Amino acid sequence: MCTLYNEPPTRSPRAFPLFSALAVGLIAVVAAAVSAVDPSELRRLVSTYTGLSFSNTTFDGVDCTLAEQYVTDVLPVKGFHILCIHKNHPEGELDITAFKDGNAPSIKIQSKYDLADLKTQLEKTLEIPEPKDDVARKYKQPYAFFTPEGARRETLEDIMNQIVFLFEGGQFIWPGIRIGHQTVVKEVAGKGDVVLETLSLTPLVFSVDEFLKDDEIDIIMALSLEHLKPSTVTLMDGHEDRAATDWRTSTTYFLSSSKHSKLDEIDQRVADLTKVPVDHQEDVQVLRYEETQKYDHHTDYFPVEHHKNSPHVLESIDYGYKNRMITVFWYMSDVAKGGHTIFPRAGGAPRPQSMKDCSTGLKVSPKKRKVIVFYSMLPNGQGDPMSLHGGCPVEDGIKYSGNKWVWNKARD
């Protein structure tokens, strides 16, 4: 949104009759330059200054070159499509400029002014697959449209004459665009605007400084420390007889958000940041890592192929179509040395030979009040094996942290 200036005091256009025509002419020139950015804001300004009223279509339109700011030239983003939808024909047809998988060059598509036909043309041109079997037809979420700010859109009127994102997996995911890119997320509960910085595209990892507050961390610690117990893991096929400490040596406690109003506020903050509703979240898993304690490389989502011998796990994840999509990892202490979060496959690296190796990959240092946001699912709804990550051993100090897991579907 482009805000030109603060709204001036209301005035009558007839107070200065000699200048009214000139004012309208000047505003018309401005219209040519900025109407593509926010036509509704421009109409409001014109109406305020001149007293004139305009129909909803007077300045309607969209500059499709603005869609290019969301394009990445690094690699295809499977299941993420950028669309600029423009009603351009008197007979009501739609012109669509699409960036398939978030990449250039653009593709031109036409459809009738009809949502069903628009979807048909998009499915054909963007090669959106149909559900592959009865299980997929029952459990897979349909693709969905969102604004670039993360608001879901469902009607043709909602997506016409603007830029929208299409996610085949049905949930919003922030585009990484490029490493170092900064996205401003507006109106995050308890924080106002926050900056989401891209740390990695494969897997998709962001960071946000100063996301938590000291008083919130104090409350979390006070409610959790006496309840900490050795951490557990969900064992995959073939590992049923092994101890959790083979991989993980921290202590942990799931802290219910009902324990304090501050936790409810953080839940809303996470929802505002990720653009996924609160009812998709698990309670935060509070963690303590003392010196030498660690968590070997693992994924936070549950791959179907690793749990074929566990019917209860498969049922709980809708046979792969319901899963942990996002981890918002909270850092609640500074650590003098060690305790990094590592992504060994960052940049598309092969699977490491050792799940204990902390020498290679993207390493994020613990920093109090900071969070990292990483995605375990791709925009097409599939799990991302590149999201493999681990907690490196703490070498000096104590690391307090928290896992806030956000699922792609509402929690039961």
Give the positions of each predicted feature:
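Fe(II)/2-oxoglutarate oxygenase catalytic core
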Residues: 2-412
